[in-house]
């Protein structure tokens, strides 16, 4: 899922749903954009740009970045463990 280029300072872990979403992204031709965002998360999950937003409601505590106009990469950050948990990589409006 994540290209091996560059130094990864944060460990990325993926939910089962995120792994399923990765297959959808590949089929939709969105894999390069998603890989670019994942690389940024591995280096610094709070880097801006690209912009991110803190989510509320059911996903309170998580963050979201745009893959495209419809789809978002949703993740949680565990600063104490230097872990980024990727929750979704498709729309979070379903």
Task: Please tell me what each predicted stretch does.
Residues 1-24, 28-36, 56, 65-72, ...:
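Enriched for short, Lys/Arg-rich terminal
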Residues 39-66:
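A short, surface-exposed loop/turn module that caps and links secondary-structure elements
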